[in-house]
């Protein structure tokens, strides 16, 4: 039976921590100041990692999708330096190739939350209109 917290998961978690620290202390690009690594997925051979990012202060709508694409490109351009920093701090034979992807789960969760609140308000208005609730 596989270990509950496998080596792959431990490495992914460690990569997440190290990149978050690097973004705070080693990357000086102002466009990446409010970047958070939400999670990392590592391939089975540990040769590549998909890094899911959230940009604080940006919500996913038509106006900001271009800004998100620009920031992802900036992160991808810095991926060599980030890999170098990972190689210095992590003891791995091969440092995974990094691919940065925007994590839409937060904006999707906010959207779902707004829909639920809208439905609750409409139900409450309907109940008041029908005299069921004051």
UniProtKB/Swiss-Prot annotation:
It is found in: Cytoplasm. GO terms for molecular function: ribosomal small subunit binding. GO terms for cellular component: cytosol. Keywords: Cytoplasm, Ribosome biogenesis. It holds the Pfam family RBFA. One of its GO terms (biological process) is maturation of SSU-rRNA. Its main location: cytoplasm. Belongs to the RbfA family. HAMAP family: RbfA (MF_00003). Monomer. Binds 30S ribosomal subunits, but not 50S ribosomal subunits or 70S ribosomes. One of several proteins that assist in the late maturation steps of the functional core of the 30S ribosomal subunit. Associates with free 30S ribosomal subunits (but not with 30S subunits that are part of 70S ribosomes or polysomes). Required for efficient processing of 16S rRNA. May interact with the 5'-terminal helix region of 16S rRNA. This is Ribosome-binding factor A. It comes from Baumannia cicadellinicola subsp. Homalodisca coagulata.
